[in-house]
Amino acid sequence: QQRYLNAKRYVKLAIVADRSMVTKHNGKLKKLRKWIYRIVNTINEVYRSLNILVALVYLEIWSKEDLINVTSAAKDTLASFGNWRATDLLKRRSHDAAHLLTNIKFDGTTVGKAYVASMCQQDSSVGINQDHSKINLLVALTMAHELGHNLGMSHDVVNTEKQCNCGTCVMAPTISDQISKLFSNCSKNDYENFLTLYKPQCILNEPSKTDIVSPPVCGNELLEVGEECDCGSPETCQNPCCDAATCKLTSGSQCAKGLCCDQCKFSKSGTECRAAKDDCDIAESCTGQSADCPTDDLQRNGQPCGNNAQYCRKGKCPIMTNQCISFYGPNAAVAPDACFDYNLKGEGNFYCRKEQATIFPCAQKDKKCGRLFCVLGPTGKRISCEHTYSQDDPDIGMVLPGTKCADGKVCNSNRECVDVNTAY
């Protein structure tokens, strides 16, 4: 648990500057970009204390017209920006969170708004920020504050039972000239709780050099174009393989970090760098030519797993019993074959396939690839065939593709029980 909490995180940030920002900078896009690069450098500095690096991986400037309706109603603007990000921006450019920068003044004293504990979520990993000051630092701290909400942080409240007692930390409810670059203990706890509860996956991946669109800054701990390594400032760098002042490898070093970097040299070929997680995963080993562990690879589809009783599919070992347990708890088991006869009827929720409104009953050989039936606890004389159905997602409660349905056979994506050798 502690290792998971202490792991370095990377927020790959996309920033969108709207038309009002272009007008504010008199159409000088170069000047506007510089303003935004400075903001991101500050945000990255602020977050380094939490072992988070923030990298700008995309910058979009709406120089002709706004692609959403940006208004003084912050709540509405946030909702439409989130919707636009999910339906448009995410399809074009991979990133973890998107923030809007606008010169439109929001109602009341609001200078920013963001969804809380939403990092990595499709439509809510967003924030909106007003470019409310001539002082770059104050705008940067506003965006850092809104990003804090995405990462699960609520406002610091002074003199409550929580005793954050930091009136000037990043998550202070109101902005002031005394604002600092520090996070309160409350913010740190909120962030750790968010990691534990939501387990956001997207921020575990480091951006590649070429993903980062802002000019490289030696000493910001992000590996950027033109750098061989970046271990932070000369004062804080603790990596003997990297020269902090130049971001070049020290003399005789082959690497500065990586799962296959050992004491500044590439690990020997064959050194295991990622263990197999389970039957359907493959262990990876170093090549001897690189500091990186090869891409995570999976066992081939159809490879036996689960004590040779099941078969792998896309890195998972789909077991019918486990599917019952996930719906009904640890005492659940797969129902007797008689229950699966319901799937032969093709009535109600019992079928193999549904296309538009047409229901296709299962053929006798395919009945264990349709609706899943389970029993709860020990069965008496009467068996109740438990099943699950969802109006929203017709696939919920169906036997998962790749599940064994007979000896040497698995359910394919058409819910037919086919020979495992022809299924893949």
Curated annotation (Swiss-Prot):
All disulfide bonds of the chain are 120-202, 164-186, 166-169, 218-247, 229-242, 231-237, 241-264, 255-261, 260-286, 273-293, 280-312, 305-317, 324-374, 339-385, 352-362, 369-411, 405-417
Occurrences of domain Peptidase M12B (ranges)? 9-207
Which annotated residues bind Zn(2+)? 145, 149, 155
Residue intervals of the Disintegrin domain: 215-301
The alphabetized UniProt keywords are: Disulfide bond, Fibrinogenolytic toxin, Glycoprotein, Hemostasis impairing toxin, Hydrolase, Metal-binding, Pyrrolidone carboxylic acid, Secreted, Toxin, Zinc
Q: Indicate which residues the UniProt annotation says bind Ca(2+) 3.
A: 281, 284, 296
GO cellular component terms, alphabetically, are: extracellular region; plasma membrane
Q: Which residues form the active site?
A: 146
UniProt note on regulation of activity: Its proteolytic activity is inhibited by EDTA, TPEN, 1,10-phenanthroline, and some thiol compounds, but is enhanced by alkaline earth metal ions (Mg2+, Ca2+, Sr2+, and Ba2+). Its activity is not modulated by urea (4 M).
User: Which parts of the sequence carry Pyrrolidone carboxylic acid?
Assistant: 1
| Cofactors demanded by this protein | Zn(2+)
Spell out the protein name for this chain: Zinc metalloproteinase-disintegrin-like brevilysin H2b
Which lineage is the organism of this entry classified under, starting from the top rank?
Eukaryota, Metazoa, Chordata, Craniata, Vertebrata
